[in-house]
C-alpha cells in the first residue's frame, strides 16, 4: 500500500496535468453551451493554480489558447487583457520599488527608525513591525522580509551572545561562593533559572521573526500597488463595472485600507506580546528600567549596520524625491473631497485621460533619466581621466537591473485574471452564476461578508493570493448584483482577506523566508496564525461597516453595478 502511494505521489504532477482536462471534458460534451465551455477553462486553471503543476504565470496564459479554441472570445479580445491600465499601474509601482531596493534606501529608512524606537523588546518589536509594514506598502512583501529578517537575526544573535557571556561570568562567581556555603544551604536553582532564560530567549526569537512576516503581509494591504490582490480588485472593477468612474483609485483605497492596516498592526503586536512575552510590559517595554547588556548589544548592532551605509548619497536623495513625487501625484490626482490636478486639463465630459497608471509610468521613466551622481560642470580643472568619462552620469536605473528584478510573472497573472473576467461576461457565465446565488438574498449582508472573508482567508493559505482573488472576485461580483448588494461591500473585504496568509510556511513567501531561519515550527505558525486570521477578518469587517461605508457609499446599490449598464 505504501509503495503504491509513493508511486502515485511520484507521478502526481503528471496525472493532474494530463488527466484533469480529460475528467472535465464531459462538462463540455454534455452541455455544449458557451458559458459551460468558459466554466471548463476556469475550473481547469483553478486546479492548475492550486496545485502549481505548471508555473502560475504559464497557467495564466491559457485563456489566450483556450478561449479562441472554444469560441468564447477571439484572440485579439483576449490578448488585450494582458496589458491593461491596471497592469501598467502595477508595473510602474514595481519599477519604483526596484530603484528603492537598488540604492538601499529601504534599509536606511528601516535602521534609522529602529534606532529612534530603541532596543527594549516590546518597543523593538513594534519598531520592526512598523518599519516592515511601511516598506511593504511600496515594495514587495518578499523583498521587505528578505531585507528585514537578517537585521532581526543579527540583533538576536548579538543579544544571545551577550546573555551567554553574562551567564558564564555569573557561573564562575557562583562556583567561588559555593565553597563557602554549608551543604544544607546549597539550593540547586541555577539550572532552573538558566532554562527559564533560555525559554524566554526562544520565545523572543519566535516573536521577533513572526512579527516581520505578519507586518509584511499586513502592510501590503494599505496601498493599491502594495500587493497583487489589491491590483486585481482594481482591474476587475474596471473590467466588470466600467461605469464605476474611477471609484477605486489610489487615494480612496488608501483612505480605506491604511487605517485598517494600523488597527491590524496594533492587534497583531498585542497578540504576539500575549503569546510570547506574557504581557510583562514593565520588563519588555522597559518603563523606568535601566537598559540591560543584551539591549545595549542590540542597539550596537543597529548603529553598526547604519554606520556601514555611510552618509546619504546623491542617488538615494534622488530616489527619495522621485518616490515623494509619485505619492503626491497619486494622492492629488483625484482625491475625491476636492478637485485634483486631473481636472485642470485632462477631463473632457465623462472621459478622464490621466489615471494612476499614467503617474506610475511617468515616475518610472524619470528613474531612467535622473542621474545617480552629481554632474560635473567644471571642465577646465578636470583631470585627463575625468575628461574621458561621460558628462552625464549613469541614471538611477538601467534596463538590465530592472529586467532582472521585476517579477514579470505577476503581470501575466493579473492579465490572466482579467481575461477570465472578460470571458465570463462574454459567455454569460457571470449572469448564470448570479442567478444561482439569488437565494442568498434572504441572508443578512453582514453575514455574507463575514463568511466569504473567512473562506478566502482559509483558501489563500494553500493558493497564491493573486490567484485566489482572480478566481473569487468575479463570482462575488455576480453574486452581489443578483441579490442587489453593492459589489464593493463583498469585494473589498475579500480582497484584503486574500493577504491574510498567516498560518503556514508555504502560504506566502514572507512566511517561508522567516521559517528557514529555524526559530519556528509549523505548529508555532499555525497556533499563532489561526488567531491572526480571525483578527484580520474581523478588523476588515469593522472597516467595511464603518468608514468604508462613507468612502464608497456601500449602503446603496449603485447604478454602475446595474447589469443593464454593463457591456457584454
UniProtKB/Swiss-Prot annotation:
InterPro entries: Na/sul_symport_CS, SLC13A/DASS. It holds the Pfam family Na_sulph_symp. Changing residue 219 to E: Loss of localization to plasma membrane; loss of function in citrate transport. Keywords: Amelogenesis imperfecta, Cell membrane, Disease variant, Epilepsy, Glycoprotein, Ion transport, Membrane, Sodium, Sodium transport, Symport, Transmembrane, Transmembrane helix, Transport. It is found in: Cell membrane. The chain crosses the membrane at residues 13-33, 53-73, 80-100, 124-144, 215-235, 252-272, 311-331, 353-373, 406-426, 439-459, 487-507, 528-548. GO terms for molecular function: citrate transmembrane transporter activity; identical protein binding; organic acid:sodium symporter activity; sodium:dicarboxylate symporter activity; succinate transmembrane transporter activity. Changing residue 524 to H: In DEE25; loss of function in citrate transport; no effect on localization to plasma membrane. Signal peptide: none annotated. Inhibited by (R)-2-(4-(tert-butyl)phenethyl)-2-hydroxysuccinic acid (also known as PF-06649298). Stimulated by Li(+) in the presence of Na(+), moreover changes stoichiometry from 4:1 to 2:1 Na(+):citrate. One of its GO terms (cellular component) is nucleoplasm. Changing residue 409 to Q: No effect on its function in citrate transport. GO terms for biological process: alpha-ketoglutarate transport; cellular response to lithium ion; citrate transport; fumarate transport; oxaloacetate transport; succinate transport; transmembrane transport. It catalyses: citrate(out) + 4 Na(+)(out) = citrate(in) + 4 Na(+)(in). The keyword Metal-binding does not apply. Changing residue 243 to N: No effect on localization to plasma membrane; no effect on its function in citrate transport. Glycans are attached at residue 562. It is a multi-pass membrane protein. Expressed most predominantly in the liver, with moderate expression detectable in the brain and testis. Homodimer. High-affinity sodium/citrate cotransporter that mediates the entry of citrate into cells, which is a critical participant of biochemical pathways. May function in various metabolic processes in which citrate has a critical role such as energy production (Krebs cycle), fatty acid synthesis, cholesterol synthesis, glycolysis, and gluconeogenesis. Transports citrate into the cell in a Na(+)-dependent manner, recognizing the trivalent form of citrate (physiological pH) rather than the divalent form. It is linked to Developmental and epileptic encephalopathy 25, with amelogenesis imperfecta: An autosomal recessive disease characterized by subclinical seizures appearing in the first days of life, evolving to severe epileptic disease. Affected individuals have profound or severe delayed development with lack of speech, and most patients do not acquire the ability to sit. Additional variable features include axial hypotonia, peripheral hypertonia, and abnormal involuntary movements such as dystonia and choreoathetosis. Belongs to the SLC13A/DASS transporter (TC 2.A.47) family. NADC subfamily. This is Na(+)/citrate cotransporter. It comes from Homo sapiens.
Amino acid at each position: 500500500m505504501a509503495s503504491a502511494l509513493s508511486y502515485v505521489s511520484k507521478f502526481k504532477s503528471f496525472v493532474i496535468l494530463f488527466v484533469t482536462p480529460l475528467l472535465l471534458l464531459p462538462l463540455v460534451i454534455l452541455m455544449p453551451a458557451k458559458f459551460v465551455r468558459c466554466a471548463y477553462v476556469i475550473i481547469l486553471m483553478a486546479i492548475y493554480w492550486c496545485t502549481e503543476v505548471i508555473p502560475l504565470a504559464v497557467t495564466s496564459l491559457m485563456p489566450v489558447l483556450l478561449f479562441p479554441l472554444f469560441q468564447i472570445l477571439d484572440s485579439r479580445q483576449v490578448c488585450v487583457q494582458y496589458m491593461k491600465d491596471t497592469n501598467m499601474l502595477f508595473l510602474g509601482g514595481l519599477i519604483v520599488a526596484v530603484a528603492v531596493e537598488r540604492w538601499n534606501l529601504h534599509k536606511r529608512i528601516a535602521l534609522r527608525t529602529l534606532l529612534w524606537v530603541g532596543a527594549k523588546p516590546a518597543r523593538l518589536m513594534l519598531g520592526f513591525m512598523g518599519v516592515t509594514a511601511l516598506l511593504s506598502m511600496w515594495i514587495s512583501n518578499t523583498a521587505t522580509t528578505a531585507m528585514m529578517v537578517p537585521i532581526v537575526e543579527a540583533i538576536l544573535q548579538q543579544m544571545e551572545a551577550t546573555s551567554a557571556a553574562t551567564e558564564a561570568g555569573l557561573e564562575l562567581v557562583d562556583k567561588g561562593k559555593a565553597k563557602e556555603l554549608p551543604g544544607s544551604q546549597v539550593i540547586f536553582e541555577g539550572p532552573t533559572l538558566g532554562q527559564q532564560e533560555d525559554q524566554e530567549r526562544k520565545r523572543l526569537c519566535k516573536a521577533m521573526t513572526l512579527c516581520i512576516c505578519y507586518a509584511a503581509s499586513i502592510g501590503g494591504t494599505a496601498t493599491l500597488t502594495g500587493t497583487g490582490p489589491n491590483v486585481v480588485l482594481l482591474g476587475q472593477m474596471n473590467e466588470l463595472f466600467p461605469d464605476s468612474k474611477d471609484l477605486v483609485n489610489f487615494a480612496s483605497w488608501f483612505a480605506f485600507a491604511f487605517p485598517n492596516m494600523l488597527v491590524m498592526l496594533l492587534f497583531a503586536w498585542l497578540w504576539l506580546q500575549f503569546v510570547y512575552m506574557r504581557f510583562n510590559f514593565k520588563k519588555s517595554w522597559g518603563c523606568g528600567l535601566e537598559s540591560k547588556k543584551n539591549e545595549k548589544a542590540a542597539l550596537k548592532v543597529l548603529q553598526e549596520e547604519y554606520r556601514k551605509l555611510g552618509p546619504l548619497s546623491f542617488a538615494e536623495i534622488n530616489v527619495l524625491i522621485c518616490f515623494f513625487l509619485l505619492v503626491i501625484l497619486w494622492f492629488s490626482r483625484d482625491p475625491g473631497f476636492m478637485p485634483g490636478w486631473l481636472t485642470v486639463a485632462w477631463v473632457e465630459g465623462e472621459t478622464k485621460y490621466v489615471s494612476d497608471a499614467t503617474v506610475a509610468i511617468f515616475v518610472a521613466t524619470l528613474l531612467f533619466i535622473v542621474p545617480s551622481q552629481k554632474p560635473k560642470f567644471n571642465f577646465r580643472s578636470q583631470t585627463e581621466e575625468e575628461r574621458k568619462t561621460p558628462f552625464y552620469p549613469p541614471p538611477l536605473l538601467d534596463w538590465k537591473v530592472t529586467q532582472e528584478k521585476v517579477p514579470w510573472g505577476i503581470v501575466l497573472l493579473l492579465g490572466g485574471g482579467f481575461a477570465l473576467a472578460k470571458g465570463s461576461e462574454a459567455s454569460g457565465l457571470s449572469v448564470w452564476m448570479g442567478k444561482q446565488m439569488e437565494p442568498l438574498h434572504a441572508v443578512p449582508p453582514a453575514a455574507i461578508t463575514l463568511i466569504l472573508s473567512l473562506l478566502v482567508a482559509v483558501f489563500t493559505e494553500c493558493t497564491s493570493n493573486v490567484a485566489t482573488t482572480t478566481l473569487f472576485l468575479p463570482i462575488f461580483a455576480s453574486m452581489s448584483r443578483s441579490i442587489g448588494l453593492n459589489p464593493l461591500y463583498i469585494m473589498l473585504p475579500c480582497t484584503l482577506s486574500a493577504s491574510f496568509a498567516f498560518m503556514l510556511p508555504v502560504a506566502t513567501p514572507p512566511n517561508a523566508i522567516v521559517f528557514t531561519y529555524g526559530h519556528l515550527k509549523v505548529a508555532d505558525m499555525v497556533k499563532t496564525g489561526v488567531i491572526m486570521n480571525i483578527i484580520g477578518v474581523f478588523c476588515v469587517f469593522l472597516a467595511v461597516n464603518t468608514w468604508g461605508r462613507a468612502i464608497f457609499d456601500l449602503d446603496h446599490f449603485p447604478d454602475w453595478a446595474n447589469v443593464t449598464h454593463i457591456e457584454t
